C-alpha cells in the first residue's frame, strides 16, 4: 500500500504510536520512529528492521521547533523526502483529572506544549517537504476526551481538533490532507499507569462494545486516512471508540 512512501510517527516508542509505525512498515513505508524516549524508539525501529521493514529512529521533543526540524532533516537526509506524518506524541499526566482552577501552571504549560502545540510544531516542520513531493497526508491523535469532559487533557484534544480543521484549510491548496483520530479508552501501558482501576471499570461501562480498545483497533483507520482511498477527506475527526460517544 505504501511502497516508496516515507512516514514519520511521533510518540512511536510504545503503545499506539508503536502500532502505527509497525503497521506502516508492514505496508511498505519507510518509517521514522520518533520519540523523546530515544532508547524505546531505537528498540521499535530495530524490531521493524528485524521483521523485514525499513526504519530509523530519531529522538524528538515535539514541543521544540529545533528538535522537530532536526527530526525532519534526518528523515529527508536518509529517505529523500516525507509523505506522511502521524502526530501521536503525548503525555498523559492530565488523566489524574486536575481542575483547570487548581493545576500548577508550569505543568499545564508543559502538558499543552506537547499534547497541543506539538501537533502544530511538527506540522510546520514537515509541510514544505510534503509540498515538494506533490502533497501528503497527516493524521493527528485526538481523543473522545475532547467531547466527554473538560479537564485539561480533554481541553488539549479540543485544541487538536481545531488545529486539524484550520490546518486543513491552509494545507489543502498544497494537496496535503490532515485528519484526526479520536480514540476512546485504549488499553496501553501508559493508560494503565495513570488510570485507577476503578476509573477503567467505569469507562468500560460507558462503551456499548463493553471493552477497552487496543492500539491495533486504531491501525486500520490510520492507514486508511493516510492512503489514497481517503484522497477526498480532510479536516475531519473520526471517533474510534467502541460506541462510547453515543452512550455518554
What is the predicted function of each stretch?
Residues 2-32:
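Canonical Rossmann dinucleotide-binding motif of NAD(H)/NADP(H)-dependent dehydrogenases/reductases
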Residues 38-39, 59-71, 105, 216-217:
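The beta1-alpha1 cofactor-binding region of Rossmann-like NAD(H)/NADP(H)-dependent oxidoreductases
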Residues 92, 97, 148, 205, ...:
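Short C-terminal tail/terminal secondary-structure segment
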Residues 96-100, 104-109, 152, 203:
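Substrate-binding pocket helix/loop in short-chain dehydrogenase/reductase
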